[in-house]
């Protein structure tokens, strides 16, 4: 608009609405969202960044409530335990996670596990858990029968389609992202009896009475022994011993660039997850190299991925063990020495005293020299080719090869 010295200048603006075409990525094709009739949820990289968590799976759960991860409170939020995931409900046949084995690894899997597809290639639950979140462009959850129609029975439990970021044409660009992750134990839901309440409850339930006259005095002595400890002020809150506030960190660095015909990217990632159980930790190193080349009607792309993972399990054992120890037992003697055996006899269900069933201190093994860790190295290469024969008619071919080496080290002291 040219200004020529007018006292009043009236400018009329015209509306110019620009809409972004929304599509549904099924892993096989892209379809306009308004024409797709299936139940679907699309999660963008921006959504993941807002709810960043220990891994991609936890982030998806925080965004979409239909992606349900069953918490195993007995394991104390173990960062090395593969989660039990459901998208379309549970199977009618109750099968334990321990009863099924993965085809490619020793992972414990669930019959309700959805299918994971990344850039057109199937990946395992372990690969999904260790995926570098900064590489993800979008995630699409296919939840209904349309997933079965496309993927067969493998998609009956739902399909999670991951699309990774592709480099943009232009000069070399460097990206870095870092974040902290805090794992804090929440014990507020455990409303446990204190030592006196537990002992009184056992007495009211008849644990210290019997019709066997030969065991009656022994039961009275057992009760008095425990009551003596309670009167001395013993009231142990066992749940506090194996847990901590774990602080982890995550870093990712990528370089990308290229022209319209040839594009490339190189990325490195590191994710450290410190579990709420003392000593539990998961360290994952990721590296990837991608290139894409367009020649007339042909497009070639190759994605090389390398993953190094080290998982350290807690020497404190299962969290559930500490919730089962009576609070009238103390972990240390009067001189501050850790006790191996908390009590050397217990009342059996047969109405007699049994000196064989000892009550062991769950803290004992945690203070002994031990090693319990698992490592794996995986190299995976995905190659894809597209030939656009004519507009709307495209021939696609994909080839994937992977190799994984697993190692497990476990040492328990003879003590």
Regions found by a protein language model. Give the residues of each.
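Periplasmic N-terminal soluble interaction domains immediately after the signal peptide in Gram-negative
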Residues: 1-22, 142, 146, 152-157, ...
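Short, acidic, small-residue-rich periplasmic hinge/interaction motif at the N-terminus
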Residues: 2-49, 57
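Flexible glycine-/small-residue-rich
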Residues: 13-15, 24-29, 71, 87-91, ...
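Short, polar/charged loop or turn motifs at beta-strand boundaries
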Residues: 39-63, 71-77, 85-92, 119-127
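Residues embedded in well-ordered regular secondary structure
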Residues: 51, 63-86, 93-110, 114, ...
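Short acidic/polar hinge/loop motifs at secondary-structure boundaries
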Residues: 58, 103-109, 113-114, 119-146
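Non-catalytic regulatory/gating segments with a bias toward low-complexity or hydrophobic composition
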Residues: 60, 67, 139-140, 160-162
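Transmembrane beta-barrel strand/turn architecture of Gram-negative outer membrane proteins
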Residues: 135-138, 155-183, 259-341, 371-406
